[in-house]
Structures are given as C-alpha cells and as structure tokens.
C-alpha cells in the first residue's frame, strides 16, 4: 500500500512539473517513470527466502528482461504471439489500439509435489470501459490453440483461465473460469467459480498475481493479488498425469490500454508468501437492488454480493421466508391427499355401518329371546336343585338322629357288659382261692 501511495504522489508530481516545464521536461519525466518502474519491480520481488530460491525453477521462468541482449537465445523457451514486443525490460502484449498478444512457455510443465506461479504485470495508458482484458492460462491437452478468447485460446479449452477485465457494473475485477474442452466458454453467460475486485488499470506500480496449486494439501488452489487472498478452494482437481501449458494473453479492443508483463517465476512447490494468512481479505462492495413483489406490488431493497447477477445470494431472512413457504407448500400438498383419503374412509365406514345395522338389529333380537329362554330354564333348574339339596339335607339330619340313638344304646350295653365281665372274673378268682384252700386243708 505504501508503494502505491508513493507512486501516485510521484505521478501527480510528474504531471505538475510537466505542465510547467514543457517538452523536454516530459522526456525527463518519462525516464524517471521508467526508473521508478524498475524500482517497483525490484521492491515487489526483492524479498525471496533461501528456501524459495531452492524451489525456483529457472528453466521454466522468464529471465531478467532488463539484461536480455539476445532474444533468440535467452528467450528460446518462450513463444511470442501476435503483436508482442520486448521493450525496455518488459513484454508489451498490446502495443497499440486493436492489438492482441500472447506469451507461452514452450515446454509443458508436470507437477511433482506442488507449484507456485508468479506473474508481475501492469496495465498502463488507459482507464475506463473496454471489452479487452488480460488472461493467465493453465491449460492441459492440445485443445484451444486459437486466439479468439482474449488472444490466448479458443473457447473450447481444457484447464484454468484467470481473467482481469473491467465489469460494466462493478468495475475492475478478477474472475476464474474452468473448462473441460467439451463446450464453448462464453464470458458473458458462462459461470465462473471464483472472483474478487482488483484495481489494475493505468497503474504506475506493477501488480503481482500468485497462483498456488498443491495436490498434496487436498488439492489446494489459491490465488493472491499483491499478497492478498483473492480466493482459495479445494474443489478443483486437475488431471495428475497430464502436463500443463503455461502462458498469458491480452487484448485491448479499441483502447490504448497497454498490458505489460515484467516478470514470471515458477516454483516447484509452495513458497512462504503463499502461506500468508487471509487476515486482510480483498474488499467487496455491496450492491443494492430494488425488488418488486409480483403478487402484492410491494417494493423492497436487498443487498447482493458482488458478481451475483448470475448466482444471486439471499439474506438469512429471505432464506427463512422461502423455507417457511416451502414448508407450507409441502404440508399443504401432504395434508390435502390425506384429508381426501380420510374423508373417503369415513364415508366407506358410514356406508358399511348402514348396511350392517339391520343385520345387527335382527341378531340382537334373536340373541335377546334365546338369552331370556335360557335364563328361565336355568332358573327352573336352580329351583329343582335347591329343593333336592334341601331334601338331602333333611334326610341327612334324620339319619344323623337315628345313628345317634343306636350309639347311646350300644354304649350303655357296653358298660353293663364290662361290669358283668368284671364280676365274673372276680367270682372266678375267689372260687380258685377257695379250691386252693380246700386242697391245703385236706393235705393237713
């Protein structure tokens, strides 16, 4: 941020001095601006750690463009397309009006563990509405070799495109598109999977785009603009066996916008700057839209997130309202058939009851008569049993009395017999003693 403020102040100072000085002073300002540009590039890429140096793949990176003397030899790894020019240490992709250009790395790159690509770019000389833009490519396969899509590819390409362009409603923005090569990509209607706002037009200070892809970290894909996170996702998975074609392209339509590439570095891994936490996310404006209820005509204002023309976002209250409406419709759709079925069942039950009622009445009458007759016969049987039981009880009483009289007579006879036996035994004893006494007397 400090470098941008300093650059803007120097630019303002250059304009003031230019109005006072004249043509010679303008030339001096141009030279000073060029020196300042080189200083900014050095400041942007001056902080590189030793670990990052070990990961730096110089064979797949641009050389120091300020030191290039033999383009055919030192830039043999790169393909320059259309109107690209190497001027004063930078590639100018669009050197004039209605021009386009591209810069492609000739050898294809295969990811071993992870990769990080850093592009240093600048848009200079124009600010305003334009249909042009700057695209950065990460393609797989041979699809899309034409230049109909921002000077770099056909509409049928397989891979990733990161596009910087001016949106008519929201201004300067960065959008990311994916395509599998089976269908045409239309910038106006095709959906993008990520986006952020980024001011890049007519800037004295170059900007840095850093793209990191790490398959080992659950396919982390992360884009940083000037060390601020534009987006990161783990839902994008590239084909591991297919190598990548890396490049950039631009088109400026009818404007004088000059898209410039100052540096490109490729690292075989994740560098330390890629791990900067997202503590200062890129700001996004709020868009207020007037919504008119088609049923009631009521007007309301709703905030939408950026880039919500294709995919509208809704607030929590609106989400709850829609859920309540959906729940009501579901309940209504569920209850109405149930009510109809219940009413039909009730009608069937009523009809069945009406048909069974005469049969039930006849059965009830027959059951009542039979039950009454059975009750009377049972009562008569009970009376007969009671009488028989009473008669048996009386007979038992009489038999009991008779048995008791006999027992008394037998007991009296037994007493007299016992007494008689005792008397007889006593008499026999005395007679025996008398006989013994008589025998003793005779002996004497």
Curated annotation (Swiss-Prot):
Residues 47-408 are lumenal. One of its GO terms (molecular function) is carbohydrate binding. The chain crosses the membrane at residues 409-429. Its main location: Golgi. Residues 430-444 are cytoplasmic. Disulfide bonds join 196-230. InterPro entries: ConA-like_dom_sf, Emp46/Emp47, EMP46/EMP47_N, Intracellular_Lectin-GPT, Lectin_leg. Residues 429-432 are annotated as: Mediates the interactions with COPI and COPII coat complexes. A motif (Di-lysine motif) lies at residues 440-444. Residues 1-46 form the signal peptide. SUPFAM superfamilies: Concanavalin A-like lectins/glucanases (SSF49899). It is a single-pass type I membrane protein. One of its GO terms (cellular component) is COPII-coated ER to Golgi transport vesicle. It holds the Pfam family Lectin_leg-like. GO terms for biological process: endoplasmic reticulum to Golgi vesicle-mediated transport; protein transport. Keywords: Disulfide bond, Endoplasmic reticulum, Golgi apparatus, Lectin, Membrane, Metal-binding, Potassium, Protein transport, Signal, Transmembrane, Transmembrane helix, Transport. K(+) binds at residue 177. It is found in: Golgi apparatus membrane; Endoplasmic reticulum membrane. Gene3D superfamilies: 2.60.120.200. Residues 52-269 form the L-type lectin-like domain. Belongs to the EMP46/EMP47 family. The di-lysine motif confers endoplasmic reticulum localization for type I membrane proteins. Involved in the secretion of glycoproteins and in nucleus architecture and gene silencing. Interacts with EMP47 in the endoplasmic reticulum membrane in order to be transported to the Golgi apparatus. Interacts with the coatomer proteins COP1, SEC21 and SEC23. This is Protein EMP46.
